[in-house]
Design a protein with these regions (language model features):
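Hydrophobic membrane-targeting segments
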Residues: 1-47
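Alpha-helical transmembrane segments of multi-pass membrane proteins
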Residues: 32-37, 170-183
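Hydrophobic alpha-helical transmembrane segments of polytopic membrane proteins
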Residues: 158-175
Length: 204
């Protein structure tokens, strides 16, 4: 998008361009925050898994617990629960993990729905801009016996620019929303799989 087009959008797009711009800034900040939050190293560290497995195999549970406290990832908090309840049956451990896992996934998903809502809001704001522009056009038509085409340009520009800008923000926002949801679902599955491996390792 070149500078002249960007200037045209903000000078001719009308009032509704600005709420869409605010939505785009909010959406981008939420996406970037979530993107870095769910980076794999902050959820499951492969090095941590290797070290934990070595300590479990050697029955060095105190050192394994110390590793959990120092790792500070979601997975390490789940492993800590497993280790603290290692003398209990596997079903009890899995039930406890499920509750804790749901809390962690909820925290990861928090504010994701805002992205989906912002996508819809931008589309609707674009539509409002279209309606506002067309109202301007009809006002001009109703006040002139002979319509001068250039006098309609302002309303038409407002309608087209607002619609285009609304979609320009809404589409990537929705893609980001779906991407984050997909990543969080994959993380949830991986956390379950890795947790079961740790339980089996302790019980066998």
């Amino acid at each position: 998008m070149n500078d002249s087009l960007l200037i045209s959008i903000f000078t001719k797009g009308g009032f509704f361009i600005y709420p869409i711009l605010v939505c785009s800034i909010i959406a981008l900040s939420i996406f970037l925050k979530k993107f870095f939050l769910i980076s794999k190293d902050k959820i499951i560290s492969k090095n941590f898994i290797t070290q934990i497995n070595l300590n479990i195999d050697s029955k060095n549970f105190d050192k394994a617990l110390a590793l959990c406290e120092s790792d500070k990832t979601i997975f390490s908090s789940l492993v800590e629960i497993i280790l603290l309840n290692r003398d209990k049956d596997a079903l009890f451990i899995e039930s406890t993990l499920e509750d804790e896992g749901q809390k962690n996934i909820y925290k990861l998903s928090e504010s994701n729905e805002i992205l989906g809502s912002l996508s819809n809001i931008c589309t609707l704001l674009g539509l409002l801009g279209t309606i506002s522009g067309m109202i301007t056009v009809f006002k001009v038509i109703s006040t002139q016996t002979v319509v001068d085409p250039p006098s309609l340009a302002g309303g038409i520009s407002e309608a087209l620019y607002t619609t285009a800008f609304g979609l320009l923000v809404a589409i990537p926002t929705y893609v980001g929303y779906k991407y984050l949801n997909s990543k969080i679902l994959n993380i949830s599955v991986e956390l379950q799989d890795e947790s079961k491996k740790i339980i089996n390792r302790i019980k066998n």
